[in-house]
Structures are given as structure tokens and as C-alpha cells.
Amino acid sequence: MVSKFKILVPQPRSRFLLVRCPVCGNEQVIFSHATFPARCLVCGAQLVEPTGGKAKILGQVVRVLG
């Protein structure tokens, strides 16, 4: 494991996620630290519940992007 002081350029811990809607099955890209409740573009179901930091994902994470 690399110590904190040897990392010269820190990488962000937030990611974009491809999430599948539990109601209709639509796949949509959302941000892992979303501050606003994201809804499905097809059926309108809520996919993300914002918390203080990392958002609570209400759908199924298909893939982590970037």
C-alpha cells in the first residue's frame, strides 16, 4: 500500500455510475456524490437519495465509469 505522502497527484474518490432503474430497467448515468435526487428519465422513479457525502444508490449499479 502506498502511503499518503508518496501520492504526488491525488485522484478524486467520486465516480460516475451506470445505474439500472428497479422499476422499468432503464440504464442511466449518475454521479456517486450527487447532491440532488436524480430520477429515472423514463418512469420518474428516484434513483439517488442524497446524503451528507456519498449518495445512497436506490437502483442497481451496472458499471463504474471513469
Swiss-Prot record:
Cofactor binding mode and count: Binds 1 zinc ion per subunit.
One MF annotation (Gene Ontology) recorded for this entry: zinc ion binding
Keyword annotations of the record: Metal-binding, Ribonucleoprotein, Ribosomal protein, Zinc, Zinc-finger
Statement: the UniProt record of this protein carries the keyword Metal-binding: yes
Zinc finger (C4-type): 21-43
UniProt keyword annotation of Chaperone present: no
PROSITE patterns attached to this UniProt entry: RIBOSOMAL_S27E
Record-level GO cellular component terms: ribonucleoprotein complex; ribosome
InterPro entries found in the cross-reference section: Ribosomal_eS27 (IPR000592), Ribosomal_eS27_Zn-bd_dom_sf (IPR023407), Ribosomal_zn-bd (IPR011332)
Residues at which Zn(2+) binds: 21, 24, 40, 43
Spans traversing the lipid bilayer: none
Cofactor: Zn(2+)
Gene Ontology biological process terms from the UniProt entry: translation
Subunit annotation: Part of the 30S ribosomal subunit.
Family in the record: Belongs to the eukaryotic ribosomal protein eS27 family.
Protein's name according to its UniProt entry: Small ribosomal subunit protein eS27
Species name: Hyperthermus butylicus (strain DSM 5456 / JCM 9403 / PLM1-5)
Gene: rps27e
